[in-house]
Swiss-Prot record:
Heterodimer of AddA and AddB/RexB. The heterodimer acts as both an ATP-dependent DNA helicase and an ATP-dependent, dual-direction single-stranded exonuclease. Recognizes the chi site generating a DNA molecule suitable for the initiation of homologous recombination. The AddA nuclease domain is required for chi fragment generation; this subunit has the helicase and 3' -> 5' nuclease activities. The gene is addA. Disulfide bonds: none annotated. It comes from Symbiobacterium thermophilum (strain DSM 24528 / JCM 14929 / IAM 14863 / T). This is ATP-dependent helicase/nuclease subunit A. Residues 548-576, 1145-1184 have a biased composition (Low complexity). Belongs to the helicase family. AddA subfamily. It comes from the Bacteria. Residues 544-582, 1035-1055, 1141-1187 are annotated as: Disordered. One of its GO terms (molecular function) is ATP binding.
Amino acid sequence: MRAMSDVRWTPEQEQAITARGADVLVAAAAGSGKTAVLVERIIRRLVDERDPLDVDQLLVVTFTEAAATEMRDRIGAALQAALAGNPENERLQRQLALLGRASISTLHSFCLSLVRQYFYRLGLDPAVSVMGEHEALLLRHEVLDQLFARRFDEEEDGPFHALVDRYGGGRDDEGLRNLVLAIYDHMQALPWPDQWLEESLARFDVPEGAAIEDLPWWPPLRRQIRLELELAAEALASARALAARPGGPAAYLDVLAAEEAAVRAAAARTETGSYADLAEAVAAVAFGRLPGTKKGEVDEGLKEAVGKLRERAKKAVRAVQEQWFCRTADEWLADLQAIAPHLRTLGGVVREFAEAFREAKAAQSAIDFNDLERLALQLLRDSTSTPDRLVPSDVARDLRARYREILVDEYQDINGVQDAILTLVARDGQEGPPNRFMVGDVKQSIYRFRHADPGLFLAKYGAYRPWAGAPEPGAAGARIVLGANFRSREGVVNAVNFLFRQIMSARAGELDYDRDAELVYRAGYPPLPGEEAAEPPVELHLLDGEEQGPADGAGSGQAPAASGPEAASGDGVAGEADGEEEDPALAELADLTAMEREARLIAARIRAMVDGTADQPPVQVWDRKLKTYRPLQYRDIAILLRATTGRINTIIEVLSQSGIPAYGQVSTGYFQATEVQVFLSLLQVLDNPLQDIPLAAVLHSPIVGLSAADLARIRLANPRGSFYDALVAAAAPASGAAMAEAAAAPASEAAMAEAAPAPASGAAMAEAAAAADPAEAGATTSTAPGLEGVLVRFLECLDRWRTLARRRPLSQVVWQILQETGYLHYVGGMPGGAQRQANLLALYERAREFDQFARQGLFRFLRFIERLQAEQSDMGTAPALGEGEDVVRIMSIHKSKGLEFPVVFVAGLGSSFSDRDLRGDLLLNRDLGFGPQVVDPGTRLKYPTLAYHAVREVTRLANLAEELRVLYVALTRARERLVLVGSVKSLRAACARWSRGAGAPGWPLPESLLLSARSYLDWIGPAVLRHADGAPLRELAGEGGTAPGSGPDPALAGDPSRWEVTIWDPASLQQILQPRPEAAPPAVDWARIGAAEPLDRPLDEALHARLRARFGWRYPFEPVVRRFGKLSVTELKGYFDPDAEAPAEEMAPPAEEMAPPAEEMAPPAEGSAPPVEEPAPSTEPSSSTFAARPRFLQQDRRALSPTERGTAVHVVMQHLDLSRPLDAEGVGRQLAEMVERELLTPQQAAAVDAEAIADFFASPLGLRILQSRDRVSQELSFTLAVPAAEVYGDLPPEAAAGDVVIVQGMIDLLLEEEDGYVLVDYKTDRRDPVQAAQRYTTQIRFYRRAVEEILGRPVKEAYLHFLASRRSIAV
């Protein structure tokens, strides 16, 4: 089987490409080329000479739509490349033709295709629609509202009320609502949700006399107790090591050893002992008095450090005793029994909600995204299936016969439901060899919050055997590891390996970072230019929150303020403070948040990298396209954050102050944007003008432009009523009641028919206000008459907009208001105008999405927006950046997955891990079920049950494993440079804590240290501290940790990774806040050049010539950008025959007939921004056959225009039934039927000459058509690519080379005969046919060309038939 590309595959990649006959799991590390391997495997399967398959016999499942599109494009490109080398290969041609119908999609899309195909088996409406995320969110809250209201009505003081009292949240029932939805969402990712719910509830039916160790929650609790005791034992071991040092309190050694032994003995009892045994062992741990020491005999610093470590151990043991053994076993069990009835009630509410939600969706003939997978599983799973044994249905067996291979990308991110679907579709050995090919990297499984289950990948990884070249009998499957990294420099690869060998283990990260998991450098970067040194080091910048000084328990040694090479600013070593106590820069630094300080440091490093320093040239990065090194650009840099809320804007602001362009799409802040708040206030006023605050906000906004003084004047007009009443009174004191009635009541149909002209924008309102005094132009606050004019105009607008909101789709109303007020243009002129416009357009898109909901209306839309805000489901600011912009990208680590950047900063490494899903009165777990707290509704006191403790601990460990994987993803995004930045409150204390794992033998850090981490630095710090380059951390740890100068563990000493550790205390960090010292003026004043200012001295002649050449450069393809890229055949005629007069039937109607009303300018197409200057008329086809003019205008005319008459004739010819009589009477009957079917209006039918049509079908050409009517195609639309040079003959050859123009057209009739096609085009011209035919030569030539190129057969004859003169002219 030959390779389909010139790529030199590694042996492991070749195995993944060629392995057959078994289920294959490919563990593909970051940057290992898994997509390329997938594509190559597919291509080779398609062209396999021994066992080929067609592309539509593959099921390729990807994680995102973008990945599916990329996969399809790559396969298509590979097929095209193969076909170019073998153009006669019919098999390749067939695969290319089948590619469009191949099953290459996300799993959701695959499930949707199954649901649409087998809707009748599921009892669904054939026209069932899939609800969008937001529509489903709104509907389920409405269903939940109704459910709770019904429950409250049915019970006065029953189980449901008791449940609300305990888990409602105190003041209302919002806590219980969220809990019901959380349980429901959790169940959607489970293949057997009802069984999971029942088993979770049954666990609390604890029988009398049960033992704690027999409960499902005991194993994780036992592990947690052991971990806490081991931490205490390690603290005592560290104390003992310090006591044994010269000068240490050696008299303590025996006591410390005895205490450590007792704690370790208690920890050992957790493995085998019962609850009672463990309680006894923990109680036996006693801390006595330490022997006395004489003053001066021991080092007081060591003595104090030992005492603090021992005290830490005592607190840990005391916490274990108080948390776990202060209650009897019977008391723990009694809590579980007492809470069981309330959980049963909760389970009933969840089931009732699930059924009510299903019924609500069915009533709208809709399903949501969760339903797609659940319904697909229902189709594929036979009724005899059990959780332990999946039995395929007949549908699944049909799919097994169809798909010869199932390929799954990102397998580590699937959940239980998705895995069950794939299992049922894949062959199990009975229908044929196992045929699943799964690719993923469990180290990059970071979607646990979406219910991804990395345990599915890990289970197969453990069960499958390494691929040995052929399937092994009896093996569950084959495992292939792709460890080669083709992305990152060797320095980055070495650093990642150094870290994760120490911190990722089966317990701490659910996977051992062994040789199979390591990255192997294969990128092959050329040596850096001008440098003989080794790979650039990974930078670790640690920002200390306190001044240098003795650390608690760390002795009195003074650590250096900074270490490592040059400081980030590039001007000397960090940490040399100036000694002034009241330095303004230090005062400013104290007011900064940790993220602001990190941002300033990052800005300094970016400046040094891009611009260079006195000692270092600008950083060079490898350009894969140019195949050379080039200077670093801003677009090469990414700043990654674990959490972006409130941080992206901070970093952008700091970088902007340093002159560094940056962009980050924040996931929050959209609804807080001023322009969005103003427009939502306007919509609230349209819904109900009696809302004072929204109304005042609109009046004060640029839409109306009133000042605070104006608002005060309005209030004085009616101090007691609503602000709307005051507004009406201020607008028209004499007729306030009449205006209130007009604006608050719906407009009548007659009023709508006499609609006023489009209202003025805010600026026009201001102009009206200033009319009384020209000196006040641009203001709206001067005189009462001017203010009244503005208010009257606003009330008129408000009245009309409210009427429109009741009668038109909401998106049209939003767009019309944006256009009429000019607000979209206004915000575009504000700072950040492009972003503000994007935000308003995103609101319009949200309204357009809402228009597709089954239930609509302005009130419901506002409720929908309120629900998004309540759910903290902020849309984030709308994207306003192109991919090619030269800016620094700032994003979350999750968004960076799948991306790569030459330079990566990972910031915020000292931030604490989120514990959001460790809080709450009831926790959930896939394996353990519910973990509730006991809540006393009377006192509102709550305390945890055993189940709560167990679920919380299991969740905490799973979260830590996820955070390890998130860190792995972040670090493996870097190609060439990796910079780590983190802040700690006390770095000395942190280093002392980190150093306790430095003496651990071998690579892995102690499990207790890893599992007690609270931030990424709690993993990175202990690991780097053990490296040869970690001396600054070891020194800073002082006497509280590893002895200074003791060095790293010998097992790690030879590690090839390089680290540059820089420590910043407030004094040293001050340096990057100060301007750089004065230096000699640069040879070239780039700042003046950039600002287009005169220079102090002439430029070097060579530089002057280079600048002149660059500024004089002209875009070589400028002539092309001014030409249309898409043309109709009619438009094309003008380029080939510019002097030709337009035929009568194609003349445009007068402008007054075609121009749309101003208020009906087209809104933007979905996914695109509208033109801000002047919206173009809509070019989308109307639902009506005739869209030139509104019907009511057509009815007032006695005759149609030539264009309209020609269009009517073409519609008739398209819809004529050729099997019926086509004499004049027969044609007339069909015309009447077309009127009844509303294909034509009576006026249009009357304009069609039925006799002329009958004469055509009685002619030789017409009879020929009727005799072969089964081979006739009518109204064939086509798209044809024509070389631009052929269309635009005046273009320079170099400008038009390679470009094409897309030509579109519609062929009236095509008759297929044995030796070719006959093409017919109808014309309604009333001119001489012979002369008119010459004008259509170009049109027919392109019709003929389109048929021959697309259909592959010649057009042997072409005719123009002129109906008016009843002649057919051969062309």
